[in-house]
């Protein structure tokens, strides 16, 4: 078991390693056995871009006449990761060495800037000794705007580099190999990832910029949000931002297309800033009143540990509208915004309109007026209490 820990909110959590690290380790181990059939391996060590060496247990090695397959189980540590425990396989076989300089691995042409920094020609000569491909359960990119060109296997640039470099460490001089990365459960697991939204079909992506999985990593989630916005902004001047599964489902009810909806979790501020940098013209934000009320207060990270203000926004707006203080106090006594809305009942359209106005105002202030903003607010699973501007006009 990988023994690296971090403290998150006072809890000691175990780190894991990425699908990219698993792929690099499996490919390295398979290469060693391919050229040393009598050798047995129980574990394999690789270097990660983070500068930390990782030793991974080998689940299975299968030896065949002209190739070797190695399986490593993904270890996500204490991170709630859909890929935790799945098999990552690398099949390595010898292929004919080439004398003339012909690029047979398409990614060498596409990723020169990532793979080669110094001594470019020398490194290209070395890297073309490892031909890398995606196999079963590794997704195929079908849209523009991602790190990988359309039509190629979804093995991101850093894992590609890791796989090649680890194989080259153990590849005998003059030899050349083909490496095929596969994930037997990849197509099934991919349905629980961002891949379908990004136009990556048939499997998961081989990911990782550091090689290490950090538990509850905000950076990893923000990276996913940025990728989705960047990709969807190519064909959409307007995007629809929502917070999670409930909002995502409600967007479908409202008739928004999957190609324009982005789930941004609690990181609405980051998502808005990314929209601006990607030249998005307008956004519609769709959310539960509990999350949306925080934005009206000027909070752009809506996680409860960052800001617990919700009922106070409803209470303040009621007071500003001149409602009796007994009603204001009743709102503050509720446990949730959901409860407050149900307690109030019908007849408070002006209240929700005022909250909506403040949401739009705060967002425009946050992005310095660089986005047109509409808002949709609901309670329960999909009960609308504010259908704003363009939604009402449709």
UniProtKB/Swiss-Prot annotation:
Its EC number is 2.1.1.195. Keywords: Cobalamin biosynthesis, Methyltransferase, S-adenosyl-L-methionine, Transferase. GO terms for molecular function: cobalt-precorrin-5B C1-methyltransferase activity. Pathway: Cofactor biosynthesis; adenosylcobalamin biosynthesis; cob(II)yrinate a,c-diamide from sirohydrochlorin (anaerobic route): step 6/10. It catalyses: Co-precorrin-5B + S-adenosyl-L-methionine = Co-precorrin-6A + S-adenosyl-L-homocysteine. InterPro entries: CbiD, CbiD_sf. Belongs to the CbiD family. This is Cobalt-precorrin-5B C(1)-methyltransferase. It comes from Clostridium beijerinckii (strain ATCC 51743 / NCIMB 8052) (Clostridium acetobutylicum).
């Amino acid at each position: 078991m990988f023994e690296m820990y971090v403290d998150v909110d006072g809890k000691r959590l175990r780190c894991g390693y990425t699908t990219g690290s698993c792929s690099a380790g499996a490919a390295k181990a398979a290469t060693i056995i391919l050229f040393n059939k009598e050798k047995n391996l129980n574990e394999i060590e690789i270097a990660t871009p983070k500068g930390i060496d990782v030793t991974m247990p080998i689940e299975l090695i299968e030896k065949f006449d002209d190739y070797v397959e190695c399986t490593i189980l993904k270890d996500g540590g204490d991170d709630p990761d859909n890929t935790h425990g799945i098999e990552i396989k690398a099949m390595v076989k010898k292929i004919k060495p080439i004398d003339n300089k012909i690029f047979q691995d398409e990614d060498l042409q596409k990723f020169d800037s990532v793979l080669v920094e110094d001594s470019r020609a020398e490194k290209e000569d070395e890297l073309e000794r490892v031909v890398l491909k995606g196999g079963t359960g590794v997704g195929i990119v079908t849209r523009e705007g991602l790190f990988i060109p359309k039509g190629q296997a979804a093995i991101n640039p850093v894992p590609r580099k890791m796989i090649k470099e680890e194989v080259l460490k153990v590849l005998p001089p003059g030899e050349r190999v083909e490496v095929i990365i596969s994930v037997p459960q990849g197509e099934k697991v991919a349905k629980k990832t961002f891949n379908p939204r990004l136009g990556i079909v048939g499997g998961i992506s081989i990911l990782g910029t550091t090689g290490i999985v950090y538990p509850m990593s905000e950076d990893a989630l923000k990276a996913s949000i940025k990728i989705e916005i960047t990709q969807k902004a190519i064909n959409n001047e307007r995007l629809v931002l929502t917070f999670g599964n409930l909002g995502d489902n409600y967007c479908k009810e409202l008739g928004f297309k999957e190609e324009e909806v982005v789930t941004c979790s609690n990181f609405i501020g980051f998502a808005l800033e990314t929209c601006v940098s990607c030249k998005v013209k307008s956004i519609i934000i769709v959310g539960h009143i509990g999350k949306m009320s925080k934005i009206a207060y000027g909070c752009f990270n809506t996680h409860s540990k960052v800001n617990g203000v919700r009922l106070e926004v409803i209470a303040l707006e009621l007071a500003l509208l001149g409602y009796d203080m007994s009603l204001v106090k009743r709102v503050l006594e509720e446990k949730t915004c959901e409860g407050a809305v149900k307690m109030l009942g019908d007849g408070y359209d002006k209240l929700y309109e005022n909250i909506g106005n403040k949401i739009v105002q705060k967002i425009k202030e946050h992005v310095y007026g660089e986005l047109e903003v509409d808002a949709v607010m609901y309670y329960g699973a999909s009960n609308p209490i504010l259908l704003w501007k363009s939604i009402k006009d449709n």
